[in-house]
Amino acid sequence: MLAQRTLKSLTKAVGVGLHSGQRVELTLRPAPPDSGIVFRRVDLPEPVDIVISPEAVTDTRLASTISSGSAKVHTVEHLMSACAGLGLDNLIIDITAEEVPILDGSASSFVFLLQSAGIALQDAPKRFVRILKPVEVREGEGANVKWARLSPYEGYKLSFEIDFDHPAVDSTGQRVEFDMGSGGYSRDIARARTFGFTKDVEMMRANGLALGGGLDNAIVMDDYKVLNSEGLRYNDEFVKHKILDAMGDLYLLGKPLLAAYSAFRSGHAMNNKLLRELQAHPEAYEIVTFDDEKSAPKGFSTLPRAW
């Protein structure tokens, strides 16, 4: 049986929120089978649980925010991407503020954190959402068009194309495809950092955003070049970060996908819209399990083994 996965033990991290600049503590705990991934705001007078789902997403400006009532957690996508890359199904995430810490601006610190806690197999089958028919969302026309699509595929692969009119971005790859079957998430995707432009930072900070951002947790560019002294981690780091984000946004479905995701100029809003469009068409998907893990698509049968 291809089994559900959780952590072997709890693990903790401390950091600051990218947009809030607030100090925040994370405690990641094992969770029972079929409980899913739950963010728990433990700083409130009464702790509030926020279970991940497309409907829990209430804001997609610059990041993905999930809510339950008035309780919110911002910028969940990098941690969710790490959970997707490691195949974690069940997890309780205690958080002491309303934004996940940015750490180094990628998912690699979360991957290290989760792997250091160890991964435990559980006595319940892993449930996948297998796409049976294409589902697409699209906005704009001509030069302003953007779209995202899920298509049938016996595995999980993502392709993304960006279109930034900037010298530093133009000189890198603007299209990339990643297949979970490669087993290379930690090596090829997780280290890609979020990025921004100095011309936007002042405006964002005036609006109370990017207060925790800097050269140690983002790629920062002026009108011509990357300002980080160490340069880029990948030649195509910008578009690889978009794949990283998409994996995190799509994992808010609550189950791993068996699908080919493709997108052009998509972002958090369109990724969430795509999940809601999928849910609106139950004939477009089915829930499947694998009694024999060897029959599972490559990339899931070969996820990092439990420690």
UniProtKB/Swiss-Prot annotation:
It comes from the Bacteria. It catalyses: a UDP-3-O-[(3R)-3-hydroxyacyl]-N-acetyl-alpha-D-glucosamine + H2O = a UDP-3-O-[(3R)-3-hydroxyacyl]-alpha-D-glucosamine + acetate. It holds the Pfam family LpxC. Its cofactor is Zn(2+). GO terms for cellular component: membrane. Zn(2+) binds at H78, H241, D245. Keywords: Hydrolase, Lipid A biosynthesis, Lipid biosynthesis, Lipid metabolism, Metal-binding, Zinc. Catalyzes the hydrolysis of UDP-3-O-myristoyl-N-acetylglucosamine to form UDP-3-O-myristoylglucosamine and acetate, the committed step in lipid A biosynthesis. This is UDP-3-O-acyl-N-acetylglucosamine deacetylase.
